[in-house]
Design a protein with these regions (language model features):
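Adenine-nucleotide phosphate-binding core of ATP-dependent small-molecule kinases
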Residues: 186-190, 199, 203-250
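Short beta-strand-loop/turn "lid" adjacent to the catalytic site in phosphate-handling enzymes
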Residues: 1-48, 66-68, 74-83
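General beta-strand structural signal in soluble alpha/beta enzymes
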Residues: 15, 45-49, 66-71, 77, ...
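Glycine-rich phosphate-binding loop of actin/hexokinase-like ATP-binding domains
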Residues: 75-180
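Phosphate/pyrophosphate-binding loops at sites that engage ATP/ADP/AMP, CoA/4′-phosphopantetheine
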Residues: 1-11, 117-122, 242-254
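Glycine-rich beta-strand-to-loop/alpha-helix junction loops that act as flexible
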Residues: 16-18, 133-135, 256-265
Length: 333
């Protein structure tokens, strides 16, 4: 491989864009693509705005490079309408692009491919319940190698709680929480407009609001009541999605897969989640679960269990690089 000695040696700049709207695959960033993503910033003001700022910098600093956008929502384009549609006025929903999109798709694409290889099956033959558990957390039901359902929705706020996100709550809660929820947040800028409601539920909630820390390893390793409560809440919500997706997949599940910083590193979290879902046919092997995990995919479940329990060390950057290399037009130019 040739050594990179200057900015002129960089041929492709690959960007992770959280919200891709209706885009179902990675895109070369043209002026039209950029403007379309700007419009989507209203749906993901806390994510797309910053990412587009980086894209703009790369366009200026790397004029000879091709910029490619990889979307965290693109993996979920296969979610069927009865799952992605919200029961609201359809005309308003279509006009404002209001539906479930889902996120962490780059991670789930990597997990699907890696787990299929581990199980020695074609990816389009694999059913699994995958958990991307980190400071941002989500779950995904993967059917025949495609996203069937996922816990995040219109935005990454829906679903599981995170370090500073509330996850799914009664939508009216925020109106009782503060009187100024509809106003612009002080964190808003000329190019980034977020409401107080978005700021409260995205930045001032989650397990940090309960414990004062965003470090889940501290929470998992403590017996303090506030830490135990946060741990139990997270386990409860994760198990709820596992149960829901198990039914949605009609019990045809090849594996339960843990990924993300917490999913990969917290043996206690994995053990407790699997214990709580043992009625579905999952069981942990304590020795496997407690050892250091070094491979991309490793087994932590019991050989006597009905379903496999795996840990996947996901790699979103590698998935982005793979997506870029598979775009033939970049190499034919």
């Amino acid at each position: 491989m040739r050594e990179i000695t200057s900015k002129n040696d960089l041929a492709i700049a690959c960007h992770r864009i959280v919200h891709g709207g209706d885009y179902t695959e990675s895109r070369t960033i043209t002026r039209d693509t950029y403007h379309h993503l700007e419009k989507l910033s209203d749906l993901a003001p806390l994510h797309n705005g910053a990412a587009l700022g980086i894209v703009e910098s790369c366009i200026k600093q790397l004029p000879g490079a091709i910029n490619v956008a990889c979307f965290d929502s693109q993996f979920h384009a296969t979610i069927p309408p009865h799952i992605s549609t919200y029961p609201i006025n359809p005309d308003i929903a279509e006009k404002n692009r209001l539906r479930k999109y889902g996120f962490h798709g780059l991670s789930y694409a990597f997990i699907t491919r890696s787990v299929a290889k581990f199980l020695q099956k074609d990816a389009n033959q694999v059913n699994m319940i995958a958990l991307h558990l980190g400071s941002g957390a989500s779950a995904c039901a993967i059917k025949a190698g495609k996203s069937w359902d996922t816990s995040m929705g219109l935005t990454p706020l829906a679903g599981l709680p995170g370090a500073t996100r509330s996850g799914s709550v009664d939508p009216s809660l925020v109106f009782h929480y503060a009187s100024d929820v509809g106003k612009l947040s002080p964190a808003s800028t000329e190019h980034l407009h977020i409401s107080r409601a978005e700021e409260i539920l995205n930045k001032q909630s989650g397990w940090k609001s309960l414990t004062g820390t965003t470090d889940f390893s501290v929470i998992a390793g403590s017996d303090e009541p506030k830490h135990k409560l946060a741990f139990d809440i997270f386990v409860d919500r994760v198990c709820g999605f596992i149960g829901s997706y198990y039914v949605s997949l009609e019990g045809h599940v090849d594996a339960l897969v843990f990924a993300g910083g917490i999913g990969e590193k917290s043996a206690r979290l994995r053990g407790e989640v699997v214990r709580r879902t043992s009625c579905l046919g999952f069981a942990i092997d304590q020795a496997r679960n407690s050892r250091d995990l070094t491979e991309v995919v490793e087994e932590v479940g019991s050989d006597q269990a009905r379903h496999r329990v795996l840990v996947c060390q996901t790699d979103e950057q590698l998935e982005m690089a793979r997506a870029a290399t598979e775009k033939g037009e970049l190499w034919d130019a």
